Each structure stands twice: as structure tokens, then as C-alpha cells.
Amino acid sequence: VIETMRGHNLARVISRGAALPNTGVPGVIAGFGKERVIHAPAAGEIHCISKISDIVEKDQILAWIGDVPVRASLTGVLRGIIRDGFTVPKGMKIADIDPRKEQKKNCFTISDKARCIAGSVLEILLSEGVMPYEAPGRFSGITAD
């Protein structure tokens, strides 16, 4: 198990026990927390109009679920949106917005949180022998080509 909650224990490998329970509350960015997350207003197949990295305005239609519009909860950069054509239940998290429009570049990079968790996944793969460690900086089957 890998801890995914931000804070001192982020990405800690837990060999016994469980990670902290999901609070359902995203981290606060520029004073916005839960307002950044958009949940499906209805069940059905989603048809996206907007894409990741689009600058969106509050109440702008981002997608449709059947004949129900999915609107932006605030103005900012669309940091994530569920894949077009996916069937969603009502209430499912389907998108999130970063209120910092100047941070559009973050849509194309790996976050600190993702990088930390990926490092822990690699640690587990190596320690369990799933991914053999051959020499410093080199892994089995990976070439520079």
C-alpha cells in the first residue's frame, strides 16, 4: 500500500495496515478546494466539449451527459476531465479546474505528488523482484534507442 494523502507521509510504502482514508476533499489551490472538482450531474455517457488545458469560465459548458450540461464550477485551467464517451454514474468525479490560469503548463508535466508515488511504486517493484535491478541507472529490457 502507498500513502496518497499529501503531507509528511506522502508516498510512504505501508507493508502492514492501510493508507489514510480518502477525505474526498482536494488540496486547496488559490483559496479553492472542493469547488475545483466537478461531479457528474447525471448518469450516462459523457460527451466532452472542452479538453485538458483549456481556459474555462465559470458556468461554461464543458461536456454533456445525455441532455444534461456539465458546467465549470469556476474560472481557470481545466486540469483533468474524464475520457469522452465514458459512462459515468451520477455524482462521480469527472473533472477538475485549477483557478491559476497562468499554470496551464502544469497540464503537461508530472506533479510532485505523482512523481513521489511513482518512486514508491518503483521501490516496491525492485524490492519484490518484479522489475530486476541490473546496474546503477539501468533496468532490464530498457534501452536508450
Question: Residues of each region from the PLM?
Answer:
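Well-ordered secondary-structure scaffolds
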Residues: 1-145
